[in-house]
Amino acid sequence: MTKQPEDWLDDVPGDDIEDEDDEIIWVSKSEIKRDAEELKQLGAEMVELGKNALDKLSLDPDLRSAIELAQRIKKEGRRRQLQLIGKMLRQRDVEPIRQALDKLKNRHNQQVALFHKLEQIRDRLIEQGDDAVAEVLNLWPDVDRQQLRSLIRNAKKEKEGNKPPKSARLIFQYLRELAENEG
């Protein structure tokens, strides 16, 4: 038996792992599956978008055509197409797509919040009358005071007479126009 020099252990491959600066990051199989499912859900969200919303996203032609195809497919084929879209997303940087989707969702949420605010203002106008008109004048100085008071008067009469709230709808539309002209 031949003796080896004592430094033979230094030449073993893989022994120098602790000397490297690069860390090995172990990712579990279930984490990979969770990420893949998340990307598939992102693809499903994009499939639910309309053509105008898709135009606002910066998508490459292959991904765009896959999404448009998924919009036309029903049942089992759609599931397979969504998996393909998820696979395509794994090969791309999805952060810009996520940001654009968040922007679209946020715009919708802002619009819903604005409508709720306008409904509250309308209800206050009908209930409180002139006090609430002063608040509206503070928000929108260019309000036609006479038209607004006329609508409020009609809305109160309709409410007392249990009639359909036509004037209340007109108040809401008028407030929405004011809000849109402001922004």
Curated annotation (Swiss-Prot):
Domain of life: Bacteria
Family per record: Belongs to the DarP family.
CDD domains noted in UniProt: YjgA-like (cd16331)
Organism lineage: Bacteria, Pseudomonadati, Pseudomonadota, Gammaproteobacteria, Enterobacterales
Organism: Enterobacter sp. (strain 638)
SUPFAM superfamilies in the record: PSPTO4464-like
Record GO terms (molecular function): ribosome binding; rRNA binding
PANTHER family the record matches: UPF0307 PROTEIN YJGA (PTHR38101:SF1)
Record keywords, A-Z: Cytoplasm, Ribosome biogenesis, RNA-binding, rRNA-binding
Annotated compartments: Cytoplasm
GO (cellular component) term, any one: cytosol
Task performed by this protein: Member of a network of 50S ribosomal subunit biogenesis factors which assembles along the 30S-50S interface, preventing incorrect 23S rRNA structures from forming. Promotes peptidyl transferase center (PTC) maturation.
UniProt-recorded name of the protein: Dual-action ribosomal maturation protein DarP
Entry keyword Metal-binding: no
Gene Ontology BP, a term: assembly of large subunit precursor of preribosome
